[in-house]
Amino acid sequence: MAIRVELLLAMVLLPLLLLESVVPHAAAEKVWVDRDNVYCGHLDCTRVATFKGERFCTLCDTRHFCECKETREPLPYMYACPGTEPCQSSDRLGSCSKSMHDVLCDRIDQAFLEQ
């Protein structure tokens, strides 16, 4: 009886093991995070703030980044907007639109997202 059970297990498990060795695991696809787009989804290129030589977003973006979580990287536009009024509601491109999404805020310190 024990031999039959072992043979039955071998018949079931062997094809699975062979299939596993023939078909490689699908590698997780790495998707590059376009940080410029994440940070500055609504850029007014006539008034781009700079910090240590790097370009950053307008006040229009700062209004929306105030809603986002703080990251490990100290970004000048991640601080809370002063007072209770929004920093700015429009610029020369029109009304501000939310340009930073929570799912990217959570992972903004990563260069790639694995999908």
UniProtKB/Swiss-Prot annotation:
Loss of this gene results in the following:
RNAi-mediated knockdown results in increased probing time and slightly lower rates of successful blood feeding.
Q: Gene Ontology cellular component?
A: extracellular region
Keywords per UniProt: Behavior, Secreted, Signal
Question: Taxonomically, which superkingdom?
Answer: Eukaryota
What tissue specificity is annotated for this entry? Female saliva (at protein level). Distal-lateral lobes of female salivary gland (at protein level). Not detected in male salivary gland (at protein level).
- State its location(s): Secreted
Q: What does this protein do?
A: Required for efficient probing and blood feeding.
- Share any extra remarks: Immunogenic; elicits antibody response in individuals exposed to Anopheles mosquito bites. May serve as a marker for evaluating exposure to Anopheles gambiae bites.
> Which protein is depicted?
Salivary protein gSG6
Q: Which organism is it from?
A: Anopheles gambiae (African malaria mosquito)
